Amino acid sequence: MFLLYEYDIFWAFLLISSAIPVLAFLISGVLSPIRKGPEKLSSYESGIEPIGDAWLQFRIRYYMFALVFVVFDVETVFLYPWAMSFDVLGVSAFIEAFIFVLILILGLVYAWRKGALEWS
């Protein structure tokens, strides 16, 4: 049986990590000066006067690489706690993690065969 008080540190961490960005946005919105002008609407080019239009269309390849990266980054986030408590969880958790990794590998092979990882 799970004891809920063991998860108090998790909920405290979740609450604090959610509150910090919200507070940062609220404080910056209240304390920052509001100045309107053409400089605010122009793109920033490291202090150099911008040349041409700043609106560029990115190739869809960037999107595909980013999507594959996010999938495997999330996989790492899920597997790290499992790896830290592997000795406690036992064989059933190993089988579940193996199935999880197998599904992700199948997704990678599918993306590879469809040409999602090809640059040209």
Curated annotation (Swiss-Prot):
It is a multi-pass membrane protein. Its main location: plastid. Its EC number is 7.1.1.-. It is found in: Plastid, Chloroplast thylakoid membrane. The keyword Transport applies. GO terms for biological process: photosynthesis; photosynthesis, light reaction. Keywords: Chloroplast, Membrane, NAD, NADP, Plastid, Plastoquinone, Quinone, Thylakoid, Translocase, Transmembrane, Transmembrane helix, Transport. The keyword Isomerase does not apply. It catalyses: a plastoquinone + NADH + (n+1) H(+)(in) = a plastoquinol + NAD(+) + n H(+)(out); a plastoquinone + NADPH + (n+1) H(+)(in) = a plastoquinol + NADP(+) + n H(+)(out). It is an enzyme of class 7 (translocase). GO terms for cellular component: chloroplast; chloroplast thylakoid membrane. Gene3D superfamilies: NADH:ubiquinone/plastoquinone oxidoreductase, chain 3 (1.20.58.1610). InterPro entries: NAD(P)H_OxRDtase_bac/plastid (IPR023043), NADH_UbQ/plastoQ_OxRdtase_su3 (IPR000440), NDAH_ubi_oxred_su3_sf (IPR038430). GO terms for molecular function: NADH dehydrogenase (ubiquinone) activity; NADH dehydrogenase activity; quinone binding. The chain crosses the membrane at residues 9-29, 64-84, 88-108. NDH shuttles electrons from NAD(P)H:plastoquinone, via FMN and iron-sulfur (Fe-S) centers, to quinones in the photosynthetic chain and possibly in a chloroplast respiratory chain. The immediate electron acceptor for the enzyme in this species is believed to be plastoquinone. Couples the redox reaction to proton translocation, and thus conserves the redox energy in a proton gradient. HAMAP family: NDH1_NuoA (MF_01394). Belongs to the complex I subunit 3 family. NDH is composed of at least 16 different subunits, 5 of which are encoded in the nucleus. This is NAD(P)H-quinone oxidoreductase subunit 3, chloroplastic. It comes from Arabidopsis thaliana.
